[in-house]
């Protein structure tokens, strides 16, 4: 494990060991590695509702980043499916926005279904667009709240 600031970042090997030893992660695995990544991230995000402390959010986003790092190491040259890595990094710096982002990630499951049925990769676009939409919504809200 690598320690940075207040975060503990799992190496891809450590993340793989965690996934293999954890029923929740194993239950999240689907037909392809890309679905494993998204379902694992989805399960992690849902877990935060039961313990929404900052420490838990840090741990959850560390695990999410690690799960996705495993995917990146195994999917060389398939960058389009790995867009959620940036989401995990963004979440670490924006804990206050965590739950709204969880909603956008949850919305990505429709794109995942489309990917499994058609083989067309709308998955990474959907998740990335969801976070972009959230950031845009937050910026629009700030603009509306500025005094005239």
What are these regions (language model features)?
Residues 1-28, 32, 69-95:
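A short, Lys/Arg-rich alpha-helix, primarily the initiator
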Residues 17, 39, 43, 86-89, ...:
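DNA-binding alpha-helical recognition surfaces that contact promoter or target DNA
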Residues 28-34, 100-105:
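Short alpha-helical "recognition helix" segments of helix-turn-helix
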Residues 35-52, 107-123:
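Recognition helix of helix-turn-helix/homeodomain-like DNA-binding domains
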Residues 48-62, 119-133:
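Short, basic-rich loop-to-helix N-cap that marks the start of a DNA-contacting helix
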Residues 62-82, 135-148:
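Short C-terminal boundary/hinge segments that cap the last helix of small helical domains
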Residues 92-94, 98, 105-108:
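Amphipathic alpha-helical oligomerization segments
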């Amino acid at each position: 494990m690598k320690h940075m600031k207040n975060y503990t970042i799992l190496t891809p090997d450590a993340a793989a060991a965690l996934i293999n030893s954890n029923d929740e992660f194993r239950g999240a695995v689907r037909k392809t590695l890309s679905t494993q990544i998204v379902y694992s991230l989805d399960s992690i995000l849902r877990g935060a509702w039961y313990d929404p402390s900052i420490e838990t959010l840090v741990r959850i986003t560390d695990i999410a980043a690690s799960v996705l790092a495993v995917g990146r190491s195994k999917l060389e040259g398939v960058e389009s499916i790995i867009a959620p890595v940036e989401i995990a990094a963004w979440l670490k710096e924006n804990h206050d926005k965590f739950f709204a982002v969880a909603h956008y990630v949850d919305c990505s499951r429709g794109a995942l279904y489309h990917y499994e049925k058609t083989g067309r990769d709308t998955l990474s676009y959907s998740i990335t667009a969801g976070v972009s939409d959230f950031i845009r919504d937050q910026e629009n809200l700030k603009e509306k709240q500025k005094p005239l």
